[in-house]
Amino acid sequence: MDLTAARKSYREDGVVFVPQALDAKALAEALAAYDWSLANPGPLATKFAQTTDATFYNDLYNPGCIAAYRQMLEASPLPKLITQIWETPDIWFMYEQVFLKEGGESRRTPWHQDSSYLSIAGDDLAVAWITFDPVAKSDSLEFVRASHKGPLYNGSRFELGDDTAPLHPDADMPRLPDIEEMRSKFDIVSFAVEPGDLVLFHPAMLHGGAPTHPGMRRRTLTLRFFGRNSIYDRRPGPAGPRAPGIHGRLKQGDPFRDPSFLKLTP
């Protein structure tokens, strides 16, 4: 991999595609972690569907995740790769999120920025998007190039019928644009992805996922990480990451640190 090009793409575009970043062993360990999450739903596990024959399952912040994921994370090539792209030696695991879309027609994942839901900011933040099924470019995660540079929009409530309905109606944050209705006005990028490939993006990137169609299955694991320069950045309402007492202890602009987050050795 050309690290110079990857760094430039990540800093300027907010997203980089890394073919075959995970070898067979690392991919199998990631899949085992994903399967553990499906078999052990956490308190935030949710199933969305528009039809009875479609599954759209999502889970995150599972309290058993660290114990179940630790071995996979410590053996994974991802921490080293991400710190090489960041050009910083420190990396912590923030949280996991799993998605399962299969069966009939399921809605697309509305456009949003993860950072709208997270009280953390900084350049050295990353979401590692891993698929366990081949995904065509037309069916893949989509990004608005360079949108991590701002603005930070009000989060979507993911309401049926209005993808831009604001999470914080009274907050002084711009409302999400209706990107699906104005796609030609945005520089949208996506990638055809095979198992073992990695899509790495900054959580402030505007992104959304295509729907699934009958006969399709899309199993996705996302792993979120933060680095040394990350700071606490309060949101207008309740926000992640979830760590006991962190939102009462940290003040605006404090270094983002908490012993509950697993520090990894690149």
Kindly give the residue locations of the regions a language model identified:
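Non-heme Fe(II)-dependent double-stranded beta-helix
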Residues: 1-13, 18-111, 116-119, 236, ...
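Non-heme Fe(II)/2-oxoglutarate
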Residues: 40-51, 156-158, 195-200, 204-266
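Generic beta-strand structural signal
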Residues: 89-91, 95-96, 107-109, 124-130, ...
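Short, structured patches in soluble enzyme cores that scaffold and shape functional sites
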Residues: 97, 113, 130-134, 143-145
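Short, conserved beta-strand element in jelly-roll/cupin
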Residues: 119-137, 192-193, 200, 224-227
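Double-stranded beta-helix
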Residues: 137-206
